[in-house]
């Protein structure tokens, strides 16, 4: 069975008063007891007896108000400043009077360099497993960028080095500079914001992230997971020029190009106008030399061809062949005439033989050819010419017609 107190706060007709809610929240929080918390100092204000700090979680971009006795800060194992990574022991508190939440700490420990490096290594393995370091994902750096996006500290040596070296190499180079904090708890949000702004600018062809050297703590923002993932998501090529040669923050592995120093970044992003001009001049010189050598070789080859007898007197071979043609034509004509004479004589002989062996010669010797009419069949027997048969008798000088009177028995 529920009581009116159990139903309080569950309907607009029976609301809780503020004091009741605040008291309940304070009781819930008080049950947490003492807890160890790790974070990064973003603010530190010291009053007469109390120190006020803000602890930030870089991975989640959340913060928590912290208070402690002033002596606790003064006796901390390391000097405390904005950006210091610490582990604190404290008791969460909820102040019912103003509804604020805070952490009252009683112990401060610094996160050692070894632990920081171990965490960076764990994050490195995680990002590597996700493929963020894959060389196949690296975007090519343009040969001559129209505008270079530069993210760096205001009036820093890194900014001066990049811009000075780039201008000396290519005087017409253009920059879109975004000055940000490059260390401490606020560095990551500012750098990420600058990256997004430059990546959205269609006129920016490459982005350079530049910072001078520093301690492991100083370079922590450049191994931040949020920043690394933002670099990986950029569509514009990103060059990491953070620290000096020995430094190796995680952004170096995610970026499309890692430069050892800001000066090295300027050299690798901007071509050297003098060197390019010298290269073009050398190309022109080598091209001209190659062309001259080719012309010389071809001229020498042509001279060799022209020195050959056939080219020195090109008509000589034609004349020699013409004489051969004339001789061949004359020989062909002689052969044709001889063949015509021989064949004419042969035809004469054949004609004479034909005349001798032909029927005309037989008729000339007194013989006759008798044919029955009108079928002109040659008469071979007397039976073929009974009485009354019309006959045609062919003799040497013509033909005679006759009529058979019958047969006469041969004796």
UniProtKB/Swiss-Prot annotation:
Top-level division of the source organism's lineage: Bacteria
Keyword Hydrolase: yes
Protein name as catalogued: Exodeoxyribonuclease 7 large subunit
Species of the source: Mycobacterium sp. (strain KMS)
Matching InterPro entries: Exonuc_VII_L, Exonuc_VII_lsu_C, OB-fold_nuc-bd_dom
Claim: Transport is one of the keywords in the record: no
Lineage: Bacteria, Bacillati, Actinomycetota, Actinomycetes, Mycobacteriales
An example Gene Ontology biological process: DNA catabolic process
Main location (coarse class): cytoplasm
Gene: xseA
């Amino acid at each position: 069975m529920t009581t009116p107190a159990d139903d309080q706060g569950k309907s607009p007709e029976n609301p809780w008063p503020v004091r009741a809610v605040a008291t309940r929240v304070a009781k819930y929080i008080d049950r947490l007891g003492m807890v160890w918390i790790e974070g990064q100092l973003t603010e530190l204000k010291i009053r007469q007896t109390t120190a006020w700090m803000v602890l930030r979680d870089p991975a989640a971009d959340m913060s928590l108000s912290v208070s402690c006795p002033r002596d606790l800060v003064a006796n901390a194992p390391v000097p405390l400043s904005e950006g210091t990574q610490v582990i604190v022991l404290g008791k969460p508190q909820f102040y019912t009077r103003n509804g604020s939440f805070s952490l009252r700490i009683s112990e401060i420990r610094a996160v050692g360099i070894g632990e920081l490096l171990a965490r960076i290594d764990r994050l490195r393995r995680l990002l590597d497993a996700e493929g963020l370091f894959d060389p196949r994902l690296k975007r090519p750096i343009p040969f001559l960028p129209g505008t270079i996006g530069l993210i760096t500290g205001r009036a820093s040596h890194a900014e001066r080095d990049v811009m000075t070296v780039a201008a000396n190499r290519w005087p017409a180079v253009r920059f879109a500079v975004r000055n940000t904090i490059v260390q401490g708890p606020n560095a990551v949000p500012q750098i990420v914001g600058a990256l997004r702004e430059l990546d959205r600018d269609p006129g920016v062809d490459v982005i350079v992230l530049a910072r001078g050297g520093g301690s492991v703590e100083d370079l922590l923002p450049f191994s931040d997971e949020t920043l690394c993932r933002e670099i990986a998501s950029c569509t514009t090529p990103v060059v990491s020029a953070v620290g000096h040669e020995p430094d190796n923050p995680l952004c170096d592995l995610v970026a499309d190009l890692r430069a050892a120093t800001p000066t090295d970044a300027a050299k690798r992003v901007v071509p050297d106008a003098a060197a390019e001009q010298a290269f073009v001049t050398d190309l022109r010189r080598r091209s001209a030399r190659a062309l001259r050598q080719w012309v010389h070789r071809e001229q020498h080859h042509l001279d060799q061809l022209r020195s050959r007898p056939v080219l020195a007197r090109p008509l000589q071979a034609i004349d020699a062949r013409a004489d051969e043609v004339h001789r061949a034509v004359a020989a062909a004509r002689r052969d044709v005439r001889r063949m015509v004479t021989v064949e004419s004589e042969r035809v004469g002989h054949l004609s004479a033989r034909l005349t001798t062996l032909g029927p005309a010669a037989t008729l000339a010797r007194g013989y006759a050819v008798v044919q029955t009419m009108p079928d002109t069949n040659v008469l071979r027997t007397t039976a073929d010419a009974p009485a009354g048969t019309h006959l045609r008798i062919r003799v040497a000088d013509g033909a005679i017609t006759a009529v058979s009177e019958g047969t006469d028995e041969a004796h």
